[in-house]
């Protein structure tokens, strides 16, 4: 499978226990780019046991950027001496990934994943899903 090395939108999973304690208050200033995230606190594994709490994050860069840069930007949310994220991936379809934040996709429904309410998506720095969808179509 080919890996996408440059993209405008990047997503990753971060673990709160490794994030700076004030991350929710300073995320906009730290990332300095439009973002949306959803905290996953109700997910269960295949044995119906609670999965470790985590945060799904999408960052929108003004232009295409590299995997390495996107990962470094998201890693700024890590607590000192800790690593909250170890990998990220390019977003191929922004609407699909935006819906995945709350598990509102066909695949998530088939897998029986917990559906989070739309208001659990937290946006900042002028994240505008409608504008990004239009850019993707143009």
Each predicted region: which residue ranges?
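Catalytic "initiation/cleavage/transfer" segments centered on a nucleophilic residue
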Residues: 1-11, 15-24, 75-138
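Signature for HUH/AEP ssDNA processing cores
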Residues: 1-53, 60-69
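Intrinsically disordered, low-complexity regulatory segments enriched in Ser/Thr/Pro
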Residues: 71-73
């Amino acid at each position: 499978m080919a890996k996408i090395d440059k993209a405008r939108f990047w997503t990753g999973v971060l673990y709160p226990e490794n994030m700076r304690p004030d991350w929710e208050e300073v995320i906009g200033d730290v990332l300095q780019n439009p973002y949306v995230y959803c905290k996953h606190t109700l997910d269960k594994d295949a044995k119906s046991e609670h999965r470790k709490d985590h945060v799904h994050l999408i960052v929108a860069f003004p232009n295409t950027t590299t995997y390495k840069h996107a990962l470094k930007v998201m890693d700024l949310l890590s607590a000192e001496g800790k690593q909250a994220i170890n990998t990220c991936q390019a977003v191929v379809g922004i609407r699909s990934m935006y819906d995945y934040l709350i598990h509102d996709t066909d695949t998530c429904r088939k897998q029986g994943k917990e559906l989070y309410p739309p208001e659990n998506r937290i946006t900042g720095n002028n994240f505008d899903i409608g504008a990004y969808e239009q850019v993707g179509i143009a």
